[in-house]
């Protein structure tokens, strides 16, 4: 860790997210045929492939991680250290440490809009084929989430052909595992999305299967959801699928951004290759 408590090396990825304004962390959750789920130490089929196919969008620059992202961005650019404003907390004693959780209408609006646009490119929820965008928050408690939901409703009014629904993050975590087939596109705030998407990776076989994209209006970069997996160091074990899936996402983004049909075909070919490999290989 750095002297200020931030994770060493975080300036690279975190700095890019904030510095390039990559406001949407897009994480597809798709279960391929042939992939088992490790539960109680054993591999078995828990969820059915045709019932797990959603995309979760996590706000990527605001919320509980805003201060960390801003510090990382400033450090990467050689700018002065960002410090959060001083705040008094009545009735708290001893050492008090806090991380603000700012949520803006602007940041929420562009995230939600991307979610609705992505829904137009998909086949709807596995359960019923309905194009649906789900707003996941904690608006019964926090004011930031109340703004998030109000902004969601405002954006949703521009997409009358796309269904909407809502959930509180605590309830969503159980629905995610009990009825994943209900979900098509999900939008949520930064920390909620960070936690929920790691949980959702279990549906697709684990973190080693999960790719992601950090996407803004003009720039993007793509990475596996997982970290460096030091527990496997020296064991000659590797699962490249999350990296390959991230490359597939990159090609799809480039193809759509540039209107390049050839690149889009490459993206489809990568997805088909992964699907074929997993179907014909032992889990």
Over which residues does each language-model region extend?
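Glycine-rich phosphate/diphosphate-binding loop of Rossmann-like nucleotide-binding domains
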Residues: 92-167
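Short glycine-rich or small-residue beta-strand-to-loop segments that form or flank ligand, phosphate
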Residues: 1, 132-139, 248-252
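Conserved small/polar residues in nucleotide/adenosyl-binding loops
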Residues: 279-283
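N-terminal glycine-rich phosphate/adenylate-binding segment common to multiple enzyme folds
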Residues: 1-85, 97-98, 191
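Glycine-rich phosphate/nucleotide-binding loop
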Residues: 175-269, 273-277
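Short acidic loop-to-helix transition motifs that present clustered carboxylates
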Residues: 167-174
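Structural signal for hydrophobic packing residues in well-ordered secondary-structure cores
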Residues: 16-20, 24, 58-65, 116-123, ...
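Short, acidic/small-residue loops that bind anionic groups at enzyme active sites
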Residues: 15-32, 161-167, 209-223
